[in-house]
A protein has these predicted regions:
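Conserved SAM/AdoMet-binding glycine-rich loop
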Residues: 64-172
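Proteins enriched for Cys/Gly/acidic motifs involved in redox and nucleic-acid/cofactor modification
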Residues: 1-83, 163-171
């Protein structure tokens, strides 16, 4: 959004959340979806994931500053890496679970938490990462549910219905 107004010198992250236990790291921005009610595709930039190295550097700065929990955030967190996956074979895709694994391997006494995520992005790979790092990755998942009615979800142009939502909850 800032680039639309000629602002190109945008900070890559925050150095601290002074006096706070929890810090927030935005790992992606934008959204590919066009839900009927949503203005985000019109006011946010196209889907863009931050480079892994930048995120790792920011997490290190924050944990070195004493933050004990880092919350990964994004407009559509589950789409982290999707912008890099075009024209790549599926086995070479970058996913949110890859980012989580890299961050969980960093040294230090801190935990990783995921902010809100879509039910369709609760993948077996993400669940496996949660299982692999139970002491590092907070066992908390905030799934978005705008309606419990399939007809309302269709009118909203959501990519899933109540059955898929419940199936993903059962996976957890």
């Amino acid at each position: 959004l800032m680039s639309r107004f000629g602002v190109v010198d945008v900070p890559t992250g925050l150095d601290g959340f002074s006096g706070r236990h929890r810090a927030y790291v935005k790992v992606q921005d934008g959204c590919l979806l066009r839900c009927s009610y949503c203005i985000i595709p019109h006011v946010r930039p196209k889907l863009t994931s931050r480079p892994l190295e930048h995120i790792i550097d920011e997490v290190r700065r924050l944990t070195d500053a004493g933050h004990r929990e880092v919350v990964l955030t994004g407009i559509h967190l589950g789409h982290y890496g999707v912008d890099w996956n075009r024209n790549k074979p599926r086995e070479q895709w970058t996913r949110l679970s890859d980012l989580v694994r890299h961050l969980c391997e960093l040294p230090g006494d801190f935990r990783i938490r995921l902010s809100s995520i879509e039910a369709t992005e609760v993948t077996r790979s993400l669940i496996a990462a949660m299982t692999e790092y139970p002491d590092r990755l907070v066992p908390h998942v905030h799934l978005c549910l705008q309606s419990g009615s399939d007809s309302v979800l269709r009118r909203m142009r959501r990519r899933w219905g109540t059955r898929m939502f419940l199936d993903r909850c059962r996976l957890l």
